[in-house]
Each structure stands twice: as C-alpha cells, then as structure tokens.
C-alpha cells in the first residue's frame, strides 16, 4: 500500500487566536473562519487543517490534549536568513512566545522557533547561503 500525505491537522484550544497566528505567517485564512469548529487551508498540494478540541471530542470521547512536550512541529521556509530574524521580531513583537531565538545551525541554516497559541512549535528557517 502506498498512501499520499494530504493533510496535517492541528487540534486547537482557541480557533481565532490560532488562526490569527498563522495569518501573521502569511497563510490565506478568511476572517470569517475564526468561529468555525474546523478550518482547512490549502498549502500548494497539501492542506493544513485546524480542529477545536471540542470538535475532536465530539467523535472521540477519549481525546485529551497532549502533555509533557509537543508531538508535532511546523516549519516555514523564510527564504533568507534576514527574513528569519524579521519573522522572529514580528511574531514575538506581536506577543507570541519565542522559544529559541534565531541562531546559525551547524547544518547550515538560520533557525528560530516560536510557539503558536496552543504551544505548537513553529520553526522558521533559511539556508545560510541564501
């Protein structure tokens, strides 16, 4: 069996706060989606889905938020090292939690990590040679 990945899904506490964060990263999410229990965003061949905790519990009564660390991270290509720094400043300046300030990695990238409103790590990166 060979399956094709199609959707990455995030379970969120506060849909409006989460969507505001991902809009700040440049995702095209309609403003009227803030009160929806489920939102899909096209990512050029894949989709990013957001479901509220209540939506998941409506069909999986045993569902509970993860504890003790994250189970998924998203990574955004910022194209240039300067854009990594600019994205970090913009997001942390907007009040989002900065987890790891921008640094140059040993694998040749400029890298930073911020948390979305649910604590999901969002990596910001660019090749140093860009």
PLM regions with names:
Residues 1-6, 28-115, 126-130:
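Vicinal oxygen chelate
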Residues 10-13, 80:
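Short, surface-exposed ligand-recognition loops at beta-strand->loop->(often short) alpha-helix junctions
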Residues 16-17, 86:
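Alpha-helical macromolecular-interaction surfaces
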Residues 18-23, 91, 119:
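Conserved active-site tyrosine of GNAT-family acetyltransferases
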Residues 121-124:
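Short glycine-/small-residue motifs
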């Amino acid at each position: 069996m060979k399956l094709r990945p199609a959707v990455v899904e995030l379970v969120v506490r506060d849909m409006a706060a989460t969507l505001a964060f991902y809009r700040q990263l440049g995702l095209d999410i309609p403003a009227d989606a803030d009160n929806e229990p489920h939102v899909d965003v096209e990512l050029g061949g894949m989709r990013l889905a957001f479901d509220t905790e209540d939506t998941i519990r409506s069909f999986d009564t045993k569902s509970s938020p993860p504890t003790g660390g994250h189970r998924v991270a998203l990574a955004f290509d910022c194209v240039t090292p300067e854009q990594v720094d600019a994205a970090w400043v913009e997001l942390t300046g907007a009040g989002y939690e900065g987890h790891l300030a921008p640094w140059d990695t040993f694998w040749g990238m400029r890298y930073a990590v911020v948390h979305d409103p649910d604590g999901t790590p969002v990596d910001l990166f660019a090749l140093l040679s860009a």
